[in-house]
């Protein structure tokens, strides 16, 4: 996997016309299933202790949008269109889209996105807190790679602790995250990158550390 290979950030993108236009509905039937195998894959993506970025262009609809929602950050090109469109065929999002869009946008906006089934422009979703950044179409590749490179060069252990606490706070509340903070912080205090950061701060000031991900 990405961790075993030494990766320190993951950039998810498509070299096709669209990020992902969703599933082929021609294969759907009344017993189409609940999406459990696929949602397990996205749960693992969401839980991976590395920063993840979805770089979205073209269409990200249905399951394609749900893939992006499983990432930590979503960056979209200005002409992209994103949406949970399953209700247009009488279905519901099956890959965690409802839960994750509510987590990002709040209950009212999340239900609006999931129930109306619209294709949204990225500027609107950025205002609603669903995506992180909108860039010009011809800037998406460079901008998303820049984010990924910055994160890959950062303190990986601290990033993992931040993700852990953010998930606990979202799922179980702030009090539970407070209780888990000491354990998460212990891993950071024991990291070699923290020592590198402290030493570089003393020697040459803030923002000069070269982190190794350990």
For the regions a language model picked out, list residue spans one by one.
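Terminal peptide-recognition signature
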Residues: 12, 24, 51, 68, ...
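A short, well-ordered alpha-helical element
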Residues: 1-8, 30-33
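Short, Asp-centered acidic motifs that coordinate Mg2+ and/or phosphate
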Residues: 9-11, 73
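C-terminal alpha-helix plus adjacent terminal tail
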Residues: 2-3, 117-123, 142, 146-214
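Conserved hydrophobic/aromatic "anchor" residues
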Residues: 19, 48, 82, 201, ...
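Crotonase-fold acyl-CoA enzyme core
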Residues: 46-159, 191, 196
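Glycine- (often His-adjacent) and acidic-residue-rich active-site loop
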Residues: 13-47, 60, 88-90, 173
């Amino acid at each position: 996997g990405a961790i075993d290979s030494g990766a320190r950030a993951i950039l998810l993108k498509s070299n096709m016309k669209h990020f992902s236009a969703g599933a082929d509905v021609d294969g759907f039937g009344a017993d189409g299933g609940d999406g459990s195998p696929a949602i397990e894959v996205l749960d693992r993506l969401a839980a991976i202790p590395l920063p993840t970025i979805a770089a979205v262009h073209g269409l990200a609809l249905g399951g394609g949008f749900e893939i992006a929602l499983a990432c930590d950050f979503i960056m979209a090109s200005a002409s992209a269109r994103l949406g949970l469109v399953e209700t247009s065929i009488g279905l519901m999002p099956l890959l965690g889209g409802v839960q994750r869009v509510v987590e990002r946008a709040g209950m009212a906006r999340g239900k609006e996105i999931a129930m109306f089934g619209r294709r949204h422009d990225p500027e609107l979703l950025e205002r609603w807190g669903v995506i992180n950044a909108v860039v010009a179409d011809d800037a998406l590749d460079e901008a998303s790679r820049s984010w990924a490179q910055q994160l890959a060069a950062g303190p990986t252990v601290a990033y993992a602790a931040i993700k852990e606490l953010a998930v606990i706070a979202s799922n179980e509340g702030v009090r539970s995250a407070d209780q888990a903070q000491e354990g998460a912080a212990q891993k950071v205090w024991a990291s070699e990158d923290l020592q590198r950061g402290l030493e570089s701060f003393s020697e040459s000031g803030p923002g000069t550390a070269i982190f190794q991900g350990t």
